[in-house]
C-alpha cells in the first residue's frame, strides 16, 4: 500500500515514469504469489494515468532461476521496463543478467541496465546484450573516455 500511495503522489507531482523496487524478500523466499499480486495491483493504476513503469529486481542478488521467474511474472503483467539494479546492492548490472532478461522477457518489455556502469566498453557490451536504456552516474566519463569517479 505504501508503494501505491507513493506512486500516486509521484504521478500527481507530474512523474511520467515510475521506478518500483520489487519485494526482494518475497523473491528470495519464492513467494511468487506476493510478487504477482503486488504488480497486478499496481499496473491498473499506472495504466489508467498513461504512465510508464520500471520494475527493479536487484539482479545481482538473485539466482538465474529467480531472474527468469521475475521475467515471466513482470512480462505477463505488462511492465514497460525491467531494471537490473537500484545501485545499492553490491553487484549492479551484468551482461549475463541482461542476456537473461532479453531471452525471457516479451519483446515489448525494454531492459534498463543500471548499477556499476563505469566505462564505454561495459556500457556498449550491455547495449549489445540487449539493454535498451542505461542508468549511469558516470555518463560524462563514459562518452568522453575519461576515468570515472565515485563508486556508483
Q: Where are these predicted regions, by residue range?
A:
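Generic secondary-structure microfeatures
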Residues: 22, 57-61
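Short, contiguous strand/loop micro-motifs
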Residues: 29, 57-58, 85, 108-110
Amino acid at each position: 500500500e505504501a508503494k501505491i500511495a507513493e506512486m500516486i503522489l509521484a504521478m500527481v507531482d507530474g512523474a511520467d515514469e515510475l521506478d518500483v523496487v520489487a519485494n526482494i524478500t518475497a523473491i528470495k523466499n519464492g513467494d511468487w504469489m506476493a510478487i504477482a499480486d503486488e504488480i497486478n495491483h499496481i499496473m491498473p493504476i499506472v495504466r489508467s494515468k498513461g504512465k510508464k513503469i520500471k520494475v527493479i529486481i536487484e539482479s545481482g542478488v538473485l539466482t538465474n532461476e529467480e531472474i527468469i521467474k521475475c521475467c515471466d511474472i513482470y512480462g505477463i503483467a505488462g511492465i514497460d521496463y525491467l531494471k537490473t539494479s537500484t545501485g545499492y546492492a553490491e553487484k549492479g548490472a551484468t551482461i549475463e543478467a541482461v542476456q537473461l532478461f532479453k531471452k525471457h522477457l516479451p519483446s515489448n518489455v525494454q531492459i534498463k541496465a543500471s548499477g556499476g556502469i563505469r566505462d564505454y566498453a561495459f556500457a556498449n557490451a550491455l547495449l549489445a546484450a540487449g539493454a535498451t536504456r542505461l542508468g549511469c552516474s558516470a555518463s560524462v566519463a563514459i562518452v568522453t573516455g575519461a576515468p570515472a569517479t565515485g563508486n556508483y
